[in-house]
């Protein structure tokens, strides 16, 4: 039985992975790492109780354990923590303007560059989340993986700032320029650094044309898969400007189903390209490098499957209806919500951090403003009564 009951149109989601050879795999350390990572991120109080409950239903630890199904326990925990960090930033930036998102991005990167430095009192919580995440990760991550992760995470945070700027301007990009930004906002590049978290892959491997092509195809498939699954909830709350479905509808003058179908065909082309290129995964004189290169390439293919499975198995996009949608591929288009999305915290985080003298000044200003507004309102009411 469908979870959604409505007179709204029904959308068919293309079965993009019908020919994908990677099966569903889950890391054997999932349950243990989920408990630890969920408790870890919850202790920061980054969300209100209501928002935290919704956050937990998304089960980002499941995404990590599906995507990094073959890393060891340390790698699984690093992956779970990273997914939780990603979505702390994601949830906060979704309701912030570009200026505020830039401030948060700078805090994150400062914590990555120097995780041994204590974070300032009263700072946005993401700084301490990042610092603790990276302190744990660098205990076992190889130097090459650390270097690539930090470089990729800078691209990611910068792109999220750009996404906020686009949202501030109500900008709808064209398909090409959208992909330029989306390839970083998806967070795949730093995630792929966790594929190699305990490997020692030289730069010449990562710069090999085959590996670069596989990485590019994988990123685009992740962008498409995420946008197809997230579109319904995003459009319902008016936050679909950074979604390929909206971009395609706008540029190609298609309806929702037409855009889904067009995007499905694009994904089919990427599947064909990836599988053909996968036959050419390079070998090297160093047997260990060849082994790790093959494992890295396998991990790219597994990421596509893992991300898709999580989209349906978690409650982030389809609530409890995900497994039916995975099989039947249909969803009812949700009606538009009138209210804006809630802040991650019940209170405004800026006001909650004010010292006593800040509160005094704020209340003084509000009292003055209220008195002035009340006088204006009284004058207008009197004028209306006289008229």
From Swiss-Prot:
Asked whether the UniProt record includes Lyase among its keywords, one would answer: yes
Q: Which cofactor does it need?
A: Mg(2+)
Q: Which residues bind Mg(2+) 1?
A: 90
Under Enzyme Commission nomenclature, its number is 4.2.3.135
Q: Where is this site: Plays a critical role in the stabilization of intermediate cation?
A: 87
Which reaction(s) does its UniProt entry say it catalyses?
Answer: (2E,6E)-farnesyl diphosphate = Delta(6)-protoilludene + diphosphate
In chain numbering, where does the motif DDXXD motif fall?
A: 90-94
Q: Name one GO biological process term.
A: isoprenoid biosynthetic process
- Residues annotated for Mg(2+) 2 binding in this entry: 90
Q: Which family does it belong to?
A: Belongs to the terpene synthase family.
Quoted from the entry, the domain comment is: The DDXXD motif is important for the catalytic activity, presumably through binding to Mg(2+).
Functional summary from the UniProt entry? Terpene cyclase that catalyzes the cyclization of farnesyl diphosphate (FPP) to delta(6)-protoilludene.
This protein's name:
Delta(6)-protoilludene synthase
Name the source organism: Cyclocybe aegerita (Black poplar mushroom)
Supply the source organism's classification.
Answer: Eukaryota, Fungi, Dikarya, Basidiomycota, Agaricomycotina
């Amino acid at each position: 039985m469908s979870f959604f009951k409505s007179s709204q149109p029904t959308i068919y989601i293309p079965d993009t992975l019908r020919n994908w050879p990677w099966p569903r795999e889950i890391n054997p350390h999932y349950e243990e790492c989920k408990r630890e990572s969920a408790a870890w991120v919850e202790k920061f109080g980054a969300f209100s109780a209501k928002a935290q409950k919704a956050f937990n239903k998304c089960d980002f630890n499941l995404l990590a354990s599906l995507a990094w199904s073959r890393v060891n326990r340390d790698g699984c925990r690093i992956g779970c923590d990273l997914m939780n960090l990603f979505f702390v930033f994601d949830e906060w930036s979704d309701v912030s303007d570009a200026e505020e998102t830039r401030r948060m991005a700078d805090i994150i990167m400062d914590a990555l560059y120097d995780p041994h430095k204590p974070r300032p009192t009263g700072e946005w919580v993401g700084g301490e989340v990042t610092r603790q995440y990276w302190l744990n990760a660098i205990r076992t991550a190889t130097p090459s993986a650390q270097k690539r992760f930090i470089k990729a995470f800078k691209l990611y945070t910068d792109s999220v700032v750009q996404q906020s700027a686009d949202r501030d301007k109500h900008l709808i990009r064209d398909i090409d320029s959208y992909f330029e930004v989306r390839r970083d906002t998806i967070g795949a590049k730093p995630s792929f650094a966790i594929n190699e978290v305990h490997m020692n892959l030289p730069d010449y491997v990562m710069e090999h044309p085959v590996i670069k092509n596989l990485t590019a195809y994988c990123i685009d498939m992740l962008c498409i898969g995420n946008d197809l699954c997230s579109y319904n909830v995003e459009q319902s709350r008016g936050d679909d400007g950074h979604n390929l479905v909206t971009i395609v509808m706008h540029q190609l003058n298609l309806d929702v189903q037409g855009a889904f179908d067009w995007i499905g065909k694009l994904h089919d082309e990427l599947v064909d390209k990836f599988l053909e290129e996968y036959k050419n995964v390079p070998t090297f004189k160093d047997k260990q490098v060849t082994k790790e290169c093959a494992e890295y390439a396998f991990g790219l293919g597994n990421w596509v499957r893992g991300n898709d499975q999580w989209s349906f198995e978690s409650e982030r996009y389809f609530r409890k209806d995900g497994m039916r949608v995975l099989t039947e591929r249909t969803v009812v288009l949700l009606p538009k919500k009138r209210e804006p999305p809630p802040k991650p915290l019940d209170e405004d985080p800026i006001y909650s951090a004010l010292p006593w003298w800040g509160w005094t000044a704020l209340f003084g200003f509000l009292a003055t403003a209220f008195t002035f507004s009340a006088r204006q309102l009284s004058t207008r009411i009197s004028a209306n009564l006289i008229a």
